[in-house]
Amino acid sequence: MKTQLLRFNGARQRDPAVDAWMKEHPGELGAIARRWFEVMRKCGDEVRELLHDGCPVACLGDAPFGYVNVFTTHVNVGFFHGAALPDPARLLEGAGKFMRHVRLKPGTSPNVEALRRLIHAAYSDIKARVENG
């Protein structure tokens, strides 16, 4: 059974609201969020962004593929179709039907290459979903 794609109106190439959110999150947690959202921004020319549920979301056009969010002690790098992504490094957490996230804490060393691969896989996945209807 094919699922309907989630779509967000108002995604822009560079949303000032996302930049404002980044400025509102200084310090180590904010730096972690900025670093990984920047990787999402650079996935392709069609990447758009917006704030949704209070956090930055990266989209292919209007179809979301990733987000970052800052919490008290950690940052989540999340994926809207994370349950479908290959994760040989077992970074993904969550038990929902679709979404998964990677929890990053200051002072720990994440598997940078594995997380980068997850972000690019999420972008490729949403691109295929959009192109194949």
Where are these regions (language model features)?
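Charge-dense, helix-prone N-terminal extensions
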Residues: 1-133
